Regions:
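Domain-level signature for proteins that mediate thiol-based redox and metal-cofactor handling
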Residues: 1-144
């Protein structure tokens, strides 16, 4: 993907993030994600019903990479089975860590494929994905 297209996608999701604002409703699984190396501090609410990710909401303060990657993650994961969402997250983590991954399932998240060239930004790109993974893994354990 062209660098200018990547930049445009990242900026769009940073300036107009999807699902910003917490619901505070029952049924949402909650997780707080904090970075030790950046200003990133994001609260996530994740609604899973019948093994499907129905909604993900977020709020907090974060840099452009963290905010945009959260927005893109939300776009990709809503409507997915928990197992499929976890597979996408695992592939995203592999991409960020320069391991072999399946780019076909990453959709717009592929814009972060070069983030490893900026090691100080890797945590920003991974923060909410790892928080979501933790919540979904815990939910999957309850189901099984």
């Amino acid at each position: 993907m062209d660098k200018e297209i990547k930049r445009t996608i990242i900026l769009e999701h940073y300036q107009n993030p999807k699902n910003r604002g917490l619901q505070g409703k029952d049924g949402y699984l909650k997780v707080n994600t904090n970075s030790k190396s950046c200003i990133d501090q994001i609260d996530l609410e994740i609604l899973v019903e019948n093994g499907i990710v129905k909604d993900i909401r977020f709020d907090g303060e974060a840099c452009a990479i963290c905010t945009s990657s959260t927005s893109i993650m939300i776009d990709i994961l809503i409507g997915k089975k928990v197992e499929d969402a976890l597979n996408i997250i695992n592939n995203y983590e592999k991409m960020i860590n320069e391991e072999e991954y399946d780019e076909k399932i990453l959709e717009e998240a592929i814009v972060y494929s070069d983030i490893s060239k900026q090691p100080n930004r890797k945590n920003c790109a991974l923060l909410t994905w790892q928080g979501t993974k933790k919540v979904l893994n815990n939910d999957l354990k309850k189901i099984n």
